[in-house]
Amino acid sequence: MSETGKLKIIPLGGLEQIGMNMTAFEYEDGIIVVDCGLSFPDDDMLGIDLVIPDITYLRENKDKIKGFFITHGHEDHIGALPYVLKEISAPLYATKLTMGIIEGKLEEHQIKDIVKRKVVKYGQNINAGKFRVEFIKTNHSIADAAAFAIHTPVGVIVHTGDFKVDYTPVFGDAINLARFSELGKRGVLALMCDSTNVLRPGFTPSERKVGKTFDHIFAEHTKNRIIIATFASNVDRVQQIINTACRYNRKVIVEGRSMVNIISVAREMEYLKIPDNTLISIEEMENYTDDQLVLITTGSQGESMAALSR
């Protein structure tokens, strides 16, 4: 290629760890940032609620930053945004549901009105300095996840974000493997790929299989109250729980701050379809017998502050 400039890939978090995902890409006088997540403290980090990446380099070069590009709406990819965007002013790009979740955080931190934002569709390209970022459809445990093909003067970098290959997703389209194939044939300078659980044998089953499991559980426990702990952001799974609850004529209680917030956003954006009179408050539980209730809560990983533990 005729271009002789140097491309820098600068990991700021998320490598060899779960959480705090953040990577900067720099070419000449331009920087773009992919993801901006947090992680939770180790047991010996007393008095610390959360951990965010060290953004010293970005702070020192904030005039070069052309934008933040977010792959999906999990905390380990978006949780640091409110803190970072208070110091660094740059446009924010994400898909519809991801942006909706982010906007809730920005509003909570009272910076929503000062952050420039753009909702991006799959297949759309965003020009940011000498970078061109293409959004590609993927599947993950949250809707609207994206991979990026980052087109630079010296070649294409493919950043997968978190993903799984699900040929039979419950909602929406399957991962766009055809586009990844096209990029591969044309030549890729670097592949930055999710490697969570890569050393474990086997493969991740389709989310559709989880729905069948719910049906078995509900059929087996017709006289009991059912409590299901899951990630708040797993909108597809929450939808399957609600669908199953409706089939078995059960009311649904949602507990946990993050669960309530994300369900509210997803419902407003029509990523969740909940029939009228399905949801009830926790105070209304006493009006129903156990066999009429399903409780969806946070705390599936035993988090001490989650609703299930409390």
Residue ranges and their predicted role:
Residues 292-294:
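Loop/turn-to-beta-strand initiation segments
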Residues 296-298:
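Short, conserved beta-strand edge motifs with alternating hydrophobic and charged residues
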Residues 2-69, 74-290, 300-310:
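His/Asp/Glu-rich metal-coordinating catalytic cores
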